[in-house]
Amino acid sequence: PTWLETADKIALIDALSLTGVARIEVSSFVSPKSIPMLRDAAAVFAGITRQCGVIYTALVPNRRGAENALAAGADEINMVMSASETHNKANMRMSCAESLAGFEQIMQAAEGTGGIINGSIATSFGCPFEGGQPAARILGIVHRYMDLGVDGISLADTTGMANPKQVAALVGDVLQLIGPDALTLHFHNTRGMGLANVLAAYQAGARRFDAALGGLGGCPFAPGATGNICTEDLVNMLEEMGIPTNVDLAALIEVSRTLPKLLGHDIPGQLVKAGRNSDRHMLPAS
């Protein structure tokens, strides 16, 4: 993966902050031994220019990460575990039970800080090591998060194994337990079904979705996992369907256009390449 300089990360986040997106995950407070390119998380938080109305979040694996994130000024922390025992041990270096015990410590650390706490469930729609995860297991973790008192829950399709029928069923089940404002869906486009899954989730009642600028991303502990759904492609789809997003799509596209030069390679997103439906082109010379 390409190593972005701290100043470049800050510039990207500052540009994104002006596009109307509601939340930006700034960085992750993980061990620099595990993911060295995230060792500047605190410096990135310190360097960004915050915009009113934007929530700046951080991913945390444990109490130390949560304390560091809150000290750095994260408005929201996202604690994560896998539904799959095997993936959790590969990704988090602990069992699912140990992760849940650690989350109790995170809740204690966050008490009184005013920080928003989100609980994420990785491999909610399938694991590359174990295969499909029973809905009952996902719902059991949702209940555990609710018992802990989290503010929101995310269902993550970490390896892009979800399909629209499966998504609609699980989202419907989870929305029997929590409201749509407390549920986020996190899809990867590994098998080309990312936006189809968004539509299925939306039709089932979900209203919050994670996405990555340019369709970047992945998971170092998931074989073959590619990027998240592309932010500008997602916004474009919703806007074309008449669903308002409050995001300035033109500004978002301009930010995405800076990525290939920064990264030194092309990006998966399609809208930047194809243009919007409203764009008009000259006829080729005969």
PLM regions: where:
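Catalytic cores and adjacent flexible loops of soluble metabolic enzymes
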Residues: 1-286
